[in-house]
Amino acid sequence: MRIVLIHGYKSSPRQNFWPWLSDALRERGHDVVAPELPNPAEPICQEWVDTIKKSIHRPAGDTVFIAHSLGCVALLHYLEQADMAGTPKAIILISAPFHIASERFASFFVPPVDFETVMWKGQEFILVHAKDDAVIPFDHAKRYEQELNGALKEIETGGHLMDVTELSILLDLIDDRNTVPGDSLHDDFSDIHVVL
């Protein structure tokens, strides 16, 4: 699979759990793309969206996106605009802010995400959020769960997951989606032959 990693505010592909995740995914044979988003301390949403566009070109059905924090909102705006070769397999949003009432982040929330468009841009949406996140409260994940008809994966502790160097739930989520269609049916139907 092709896995695209989108970091968040004041971060980079070389911080937090991203280096560990990149290495672990490559060891499993995945193609990993991890763009460095510009001006992470003073971000402008469209600049992040444009960088994602240049890094990915046209996502397809074998693509999985994993984003953290403010990078989740940039990813959703990217998906609104994206020209796709197929519907990405999964969109995994970690500690995603639904709204932040701050002028500094206005470009990410005005205009708001068009959920009616975005919900068709992924085969499934998965929200990963720690219950004790003091930066982006847990109820933000519940809002995304409703708007995207997503699956919410709760983590008991970890805060905003900025100081975490490994996040094993992400590998579990990828492994669960890395199956070849028909693998589970092989034994049950191996003796059936269709004659036309």
Indicate where each model-derived feature is located:
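Active-site catalytic motif of lipid deacylating hydrolases and related acyltransferases
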Residues: 1-61
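Active-site nucleophile loop of the alpha/beta-hydrolase fold
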Residues: 8, 37-40, 91-101
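Short glycine-rich catalytic loops that host catalytic nucleophiles or stabilize transition states
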Residues: 35-38, 153-159, 164
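Catalytic histidine-centered segment of alpha/beta-hydrolase-like enzymes
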Residues: 43-44, 158-171
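Conserved alpha/beta-hydrolase fold motif
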Residues: 64-66, 91, 127
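Gly/Ala-rich beta-loop-alpha elbow adjacent to hydrolase catalytic centers
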Residues: 65-76
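Short beta-strand/loop motif that positions the catalytic acidic residue
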Residues: 121, 126-129, 133
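Conserved alpha/beta-hydrolase "acid-adjacent" motif
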Residues: 134-140, 163
